[in-house]
Amino acid sequence: MGRSLKKGPFIADSLLRKVEKQNAADDKSVIKTWSRASTILPMMIGHTIAVHNGRTHVPVFVTEQMVGHKLGEFAPTRTFKGHIKDKKGGR
């Protein structure tokens, strides 16, 4: 179930201010954020946003297909190293 249309999409105020400031200055430097729950808006297209994954900031280049998704979807928090192979002999 999605968010109510009456409320509009969630985006952190600090992130919104940084994106608007860069759009006004026509600057495309990396924006660092911890807000994984923020929705990607059309004004963010072309920006590189470094999203925190719990350990480091993962750079995410925003494209047109990402609009409407959350920033956290593009910065995985878990690393899967594969299942352990069974030993040959067994019991």
From Swiss-Prot:
<dbReference type="GO" id="GO:0003735">
    <property type="term" value="F:structural constituent of ribosome"/>
</dbReference>
<dbReference type="GO" id="GO:0015935">
    <property type="term" value="C:small ribosomal subunit"/>
</dbReference>
<dbReference type="InterPro" id="IPR020934">
    <property type="entry name" value="Ribosomal_uS19_CS"/>
</dbReference>
<dbReference type="InterPro" id="IPR023575">
    <property type="entry name" value="Ribosomal_uS19_SF"/>
</dbReference>
<keyword id="KW-0689">Ribosomal protein</keyword>
<dbReference type="GO" id="GO:0005737">
    <property type="term" value="C:cytoplasm"/>
</dbReference>
<comment type="function">
    <text>Protein S19 forms a complex with S13 that binds strongly to the 16S ribosomal RNA.</text>
</comment>
<keyword id="KW-0687">Ribonucleoprotein</keyword>
<keyword id="KW-0699">rRNA-binding</keyword>
<keyword id="KW-0694">RNA-binding</keyword>
<dbReference type="Pfam" id="PF00203">
    <property type="entry name" value="Ribosomal_S19"/>
</dbReference>
<protein>
    <recommendedName>
        <fullName>Small ribosomal subunit protein uS19</fullName>
    </recommendedName>
</protein>
<dbReference type="GO" id="GO:0000028">
    <property type="term" value="P:ribosomal small subunit assembly"/>
</dbReference>
<dbReference type="InterPro" id="IPR005732">
    <property type="entry name" value="Ribosomal_uS19_bac-type"/>
</dbReference>
<dbReference type="GO" id="GO:0019843">
    <property type="term" value="F:rRNA binding"/>
</dbReference>
<comment type="similarity">
    <text>Belongs to the universal ribosomal protein uS19 family.</text>
</comment>
<dbReference type="GO" id="GO:0006412">
    <property type="term" value="P:translation"/>
</dbReference>
<dbReference type="InterPro" id="IPR002222">
    <property type="entry name" value="Ribosomal_uS19"/>
</dbReference>
